[in-house]
């Protein structure tokens, strides 16, 4: 019976991707080995990947989006779009929804997780990404703020309090 379950799962998984959710702590290597970025790229389909980059957490989304676009293009990406979402209503843009239909990888950059959350949370666009990730249709990665918004509970701020030391 387990073999049938395994075969059923294999049929559901997009053959272009290795289903993955990569939660990257931040400060990933963007210059030398780029190992974690290369892992995402490979799991999203490598040169056959169709990637979406969401730099909305950044104060400078154009610069951040362009940086990751160049990185993935240098790895061999041929089909790639930067989702320039700066207002919640931008999530309703049909071009993003249409592009996600054949997307094999979504990468969310670092920055301010509260900004990213306020732009994407509970939008049809984010729901489409979530459903695709759950169904194994895309590799989903986020670094720093992009990683923080993937969890059910997210730390959005705080203050440094007194440190308790057990003596």
Each model region followed by its residue ranges:
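Extended, subdomain-level signal for the structured scaffold at the beginning of enzyme domains
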Residues: 2-115
